């Protein structure tokens, strides 16, 4: 339990993690690894095609890829969860030797919003617009080396008008809550009830009442956000 204390398993309640630990311990004790299953027919358990690369750490990710003449890019991000961007000063960053360019929302033609369910996520916050969270992209800096890139990002100055923020889902649901998005803070409203929870609690021998919280996390990512792109014929190949 101590070794996996920093792992929050929301899918199986640690079942698969504990099974994997016990299996690894058994293999270490026996000193031999059983052969991979040869039967890949329907209904049989088979290994993932990329499992060996992931568990041994030999997989290649975009951050491991280097190309000749590669340019490095990174975003300057908002310092406030909710603030209006008054001005973006990029002159000093652009003048730094080795900087290829500094791009803002004004340099994006057409649609500047993305999103899975609702396209309400600004790729970059334009002057006059309001940030939605701590880390919204303000501008994108491109440079010849990672060191120059870091220097250039530090030279970008942003003027903000700090605004009241929303600190929790409960605050977001209040009638007078600041709007994180112009269309409202609620994406959808659903009411689901199964059984009689009040009756179940009343009949329970032991009842524990407490406030529980876990840190926010995005699951499934094995590396920070990164992408590598290069010209490919008439288009662009993106590795991400």
Show which residues each predicted segment covers.
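Immediate flanking context of iron-sulfur cluster ligation sites
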Residues: 1-10
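Structural motif
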Residues: 8, 130, 137-138, 226-228, ...
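Conserved SAM-binding loop
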Residues: 10, 141, 238
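Helix-loop-helix hairpins in multi-pass membrane proteins, especially solute transporters
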Residues: 16, 21-25
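Flexible, low-hydrophobicity surface segments
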Residues: 25-189, 207-210, 216
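Conserved beta-alpha junction segments in alpha/beta enzyme cores
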Residues: 197-240
């Amino acid at each position: 339990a101590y070794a996996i204390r920093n792992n929050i398993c929301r899918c199986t309640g640690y079942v698969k993690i504990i099974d994997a630990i016990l299996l690894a311990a058994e293999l270490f004790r026996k000193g031999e690894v059983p052969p991979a299953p040869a039967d890949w027919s329907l209904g049989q358990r088979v290994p993932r095609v990329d499992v060996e690369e992931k568990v041994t750490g030999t997989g290649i990710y975009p951050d491991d890829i280097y190309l000749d003449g590669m340019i490095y890019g990174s975003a300057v991000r908002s310092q406030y969860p909710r603030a209006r961007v008054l001005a973006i000063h990029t002159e000093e960053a652009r003048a730094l030797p080795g900087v290829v360019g500094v791009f803002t929302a004004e340099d994006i033609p057409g649609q500047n919003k993305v999103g899975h369910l609702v396209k309400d996520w600004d790729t970059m916050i334009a002057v006059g617009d309001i940030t939605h969270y701590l880390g919204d992209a303000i501008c994108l800096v491109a440079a010849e080396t990672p060191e120059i890139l870091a220097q250039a990002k530090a030279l970008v100055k942003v003027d903000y008008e700090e605004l009241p923020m929303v600190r929790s889902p409960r605050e977001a649901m209040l009638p007078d809550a600041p709007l994180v998005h112009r269309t409202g803070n609620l994406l959808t409203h659903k009411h689901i009830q199964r059984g009689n929870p009040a009756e179940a609690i009343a009949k329970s021998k032991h009842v524990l009442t407490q406030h529980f919280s876990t840190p926010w996390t995005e699951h499934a990512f094995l590396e920070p956000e990164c992408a590598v792109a290069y010209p490919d014929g008439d288009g662009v190949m993106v590795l991400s």
